[in-house]
Every structure is written in structure tokens, then in C-alpha cells.
Amino acid sequence: MEKQHLKSQIAALRVPTFNIAWPERRSPKADVVEERMMKWADHHKLLVNGEYRDRVIRTRYGLLAARCYPNAGEELLQAIADYFVWFFLADDLFVDRVEVVTDETIRNLTAMIDVLDRNVAREEPVFGELAWLDVCQRLRDLLQPEAFQRFAQGMRLWATTAALQILNHQRPKSVGIREYEAIRRHTSGLNPCTSLADAANKGSVQAHEFYQPDVQKLVLQTNNIVCWANDIQSLGMEIQQPGQFRNMVTIYIQQGQSLSEAVSTTTARVNNELSDFCKLADIVTAPSISDELRVYVDGLKYWIRGYMDWVVHDTERYADKFIASDADDRCVSTLNPSLLNRSSSSATE
């Protein structure tokens, strides 16, 4: 009933545009990175059929990387673009666009954690496991050890908080806003992305600066801005998903608001968070700080602006015309995993 009620109203949804104070940026390597990303995804058997290939082509994950990391060196930018295509496809097939929980859910998610903890794949890898191992090994080589561990911890939390998201969707009604926010900031996968912001700007922020309360608050605000905006932008697609569909907008509706009111409330929260981010960023960067911290804050700004521009100008991931074909991946998720993982790369246990 919860989903059916929203489906009947969703055609009237008007997605707001968010105004960002700093200019658009994009790496000049965008096109070549996108092309190589597609070849890499092919090599690792991530594009499971022609329909999936078409979906990835029109989604433009390489351009998301190019917008969010405009100053990254070519090797790191390529690794990030490959990570993006892997992450979005794995997230869809493991959690979002399949049944709330399946016989393979635990095996799939623990395999991703194992790659981080053991630096090897299993003897019988699940979908995307060898691709994930390849990304992690490349990032280990490209990043400082602590920087890689920040990325890895963010991904461990993505895999583990997915269980909380699943539990929430097994309840008759969603948890409240505060509980949802705690889950959302980790299932989004954004913390691993922001952990790369300094390296992508040719810096390596030190721990004593990275873990300052105000710096961590900027990281949280970046996460909130992107996630809450995405809750509006992806609502039309997500409400049609068989698995995960509850988000900030639907929870406000559950609390008694109309769809229009819930979107307005969420929009206001995004704009308020954006305003607070700008004020705090000015405070953090006003005194004499290291160049590494300064470029890290710049990297957070690139992520906010880059994501928003990607949604408006580049991607069709949330396009209404593809909802019917893209929202439900249950038929894809039941394909024989052994067929999806025949790849010539990497070691296994």
C-alpha cells in the first residue's frame, strides 16, 4: 500500500534544481576515462547483457568521476571511474533493485568485505568480486596507506549498514528520520568517495587535520547534501524498485506530509545544509592551514558540484523514460554467478 499510494502520485513530481556557489569543473580526461571504463567493465563481465550495457553507457559513470575529481591524475581518475561503475552495478544487484533479501545477500556482501580484509577473492567469486579486487589493489598502490584505509572503512560500513537498510524494509513502516539518516550516510557509499578527495587533488591530508571535528563535520555535511538531494532525484526510479525504496521523502510522507510537502521539506534541508557547509568551509580555511587540508576542502566542494552537474547534464540513471526497464533487476540477479565472473584477472584463495 505504501508504494502503490506513491506510484499514483509520482508523475506529478517536480525535481528541484540546487544552486551551488562555486563553478563547474570537469577533467579534460573525461572522454578517454569513460571509454576505458567501459572496456574494463567488459573485461570483468560486469555488463551482463546488452540491456545492461546500454544502461551503463547512458549513465556516464566516467563523467561523474571527471566532475567530482577534476584535478586527479589519469591513473587515479581511471581507478575511480572503474570503482564507480562497479559500485553502482553491485549496489543495484546486491541491494537496491532486487528482492529485499535473497539467498545470496549475505554471501555477496561478505565477499566485498573479505576483499578489503584479505586482499584476495574467494575460490568461487560472486558477481563483481574480481573487479572489486582489481579496484582495491590499484587504489592500494596509488594511495597512502592511511588514505586507503579510510576508503576501505567506508566500504566496510556500506556493506554492513546494508543489513540495517534491509531490516528497515522488512518492517511494516520505516524507522524515523534520525535513524534513517544514520543508515543513509553509509549505504550511499559517499564516505569512500570523499576519502579520495585529497589524493585526487594531489595532496594527502594528515590524520591530525583530517579528524578535526570541523573537518569531519564538513564531510558529514557533504554526505548529507548529496544523499538528501539524491533522495528527491531518484525517487521516481526507487519507488518502482522491488527492494529498497524508502528514503527521506517517503518517511516525511509516512509522517503525514503530502508528496509535494515532503519534497519541499527535503529540499529545504538540502539548502540549509549547503548554507551551513559554505559557512563552515570558510571558517576551516580562513586560518593558516596546510595545502593538503585546503585541497581536501576543495575536493568536498568538487563532489557536491560535480554530483549535481552530473544529474542535471550527463546521466540518465534517474530518467523517467527508463524507469520501466531499469528499476527491477531481479531477472539479472538470478543469472548463474559462474558465468558473470569468468575473468582473467587476479588471484583467488
Swiss-Prot record:
Chain location of the short sequence motif DDXXXD motif per the record: 91-96
GO terms assigned for molecular function: metal ion binding; terpene synthase activity
BP GO terms, sorted: isoprenoid biosynthetic process
Name of the molecule in the record: Sesquiterpene synthase MAC_05714
Family named by the database record: Belongs to the terpene synthase family.
Record site feature (Plays a critical role for substrate recognition), residues: D92
Cofactor, free-text remark: Binds 3 Mg(2+) ions per subunit.
Phylogenetic lineage: Eukaryota, Fungi, Dikarya, Ascomycota, Pezizomycotina
Necessary cofactors: Mg(2+)
Site (Plays a critical role in the stabilization of intermediate cation): F88
